[in-house]
Amino acid sequence: MVRISVLNDCLKSICNASRRGKRQVIVRPSSKVVVKFLSVMQRHGYIGEFEIIDDHRGGKIIVQLNGRLNKTGVISPRFNVQHNRIEQWINYLLPSRGIGIIVLTTSSGILDHEEARRKNVGGKLLGYVY
């Protein structure tokens, strides 16, 4: 398999395992961006616990699934978004109000769209989950 984006490969393997009814999935390789993205997903209840295993070859992440995941995606290229333009991207990417999250990388770290609006920070779009 050709690795285009580590984050994209991670989200696709999690989504495919969730569709097949699996309870856990092993994601390789790991990175800081993937771990922060998974922590945002965990905070919103889309996945269960995850464990990072350092095997000195890129690392692995074991993710526990809970069946709440419908679709995930990476936004490529990573568009710049001002804090007052986040609402337009919510309407474009998410199916309905209150369903799903958009994850951004900001100067305050990797946040979901609600936290970014609360803190009045913009950033680059990473992906979406619903």
Swiss-Prot record:
Note the SS bond partners.
none
According to the UniProt entry, its GO molecular function terms are: structural constituent of ribosome
Q: Name one GO cellular component term.
A: ribosome
The keyword Ribosomal protein appears for this protein: yes
Domain of life, per lineage: Eukaryota
The record's listing under InterPro entries reads: Ribosomal_uS8 (IPR000630), Ribosomal_uS8_CS (IPR047863), Ribosomal_uS8_sf (IPR035987)
Q: Which UniProt keywords apply?
A: Ribonucleoprotein, Ribosomal protein
Kindly indicate whether the keyword Cytoplasm belongs to this entry. no
Report the record's Gene Ontology biological process terms: translation
Return the SUPFAM superfamilies for the record.
Ribosomal protein S8
Q: Which NCBIfam families match?
A: PRK04034.1
> Which family, according to the similarity comment?
Belongs to the universal ribosomal protein uS8 family.
Q: What is this protein called?
A: Small ribosomal subunit protein uS8
Organism of provenance: Agaricus bisporus
